[in-house]
Amino acid sequence: TLGIVFNVVLLPKFGGTINLEYLSAVCKLVIMISFIGLVLVCLGVSEFDKPENFEGLNVKKEPLKVKDMVAILKENKPLQCYVAAAASDKIAQVTASQAVITTMMGGIIIGNMGLSSILGMVSMLPSIIFAIFGARYAGKRGSQEAITTWTKVCLVLGAILIVFFVVIDPSKIGVMFSSSMIIYVVLTLFLNGAKMCVSTANTSFMADIVDYELDRTGKYVPAVVSGTYSFLDKIISSFGALIASTSVALIGYTSTMPQPGDECTTGVLVLTIGLTYALPMLGWICTLVAMKFCHLNREDMVA
């Protein structure tokens, strides 16, 4: 929704280019909406966020220490696999979502930044349905199997989208109700849905790792487990902006940012498709390899 506001409402008001005035307006709007959202979240959970509503809080809590993080990461193999899988996905996701990459995709390759944002929003709306389906699938088959299954689906859809962009004229996607636009929306919808299923399974898999650590050591340390992952995740994903900006510089954008309406050169096309689809595919392959070495399936958790 915000993407539509940024690119359909705000961008035309500032001359159709990404400039300081546009970025300033975006920052102010995001801060205001984030504050309102934070207040609403606090109000929404206040009735239920009470100690008596949660199990396991009577278990002795362990403070978060660096040595504990190192020890758990060293001894907890499922956590090692999870970090490798989730972090590789995250760095690809962060890179692909950089504004400079989305600008090249929507404003240069597709050639219609406003319509591209609307199409992206349309393809994201059904994700809540996929999240519900993904959660049920993970409950039936286990988080590890759910991650593996939906990652394979992501790989297939990513490969199809790469081929799709190679064989068509991408600018046709910007033509309302064209066959290219419809195919792009459908493929993107299912890819976003599959990624949502992976994200849902990742969340439940973190809980499985906490339970595994409790069974392995007798310590209930959700903060240490989640803190270890979050610490490594933030370090790794911080390279997303560096990868995007360095890649853009390699194709000639050394002193300016890509702007909607720039010429769609071969370099722009290859780089954008590579960072949007090929890089995530490498991350998904890393996920599948990591899950091969992880033994924390549904049978193990039930046992």
What kind of feature is each model-predicted range?
Residues 1, 112-114, 213-230:
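Loop-to-transmembrane helix entry/capping segments in MFS-fold secondary transporters
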Residues 1-113, 268-303:
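Intracellular loop-helix junctions on the cytosolic face of multi-pass helical membrane proteins
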Residues 2-21, 237-267:
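Transmembrane alpha-helix termini and helix-breaking/packing motifs in multi-pass membrane transporters
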Residues 111-120, 180:
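Juxtamembrane helix-start elements in MFS-like secondary transporters
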Residues 124-125, 235:
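Short hydrophobic/small-residue motifs within alpha-helical transmembrane segments
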Residues 145-164:
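Structural signature of the two symmetry-related core transmembrane helices
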Residues 173-199, 205:
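Hydrophobic core of transmembrane alpha-helices in multi-pass small-molecule transporters
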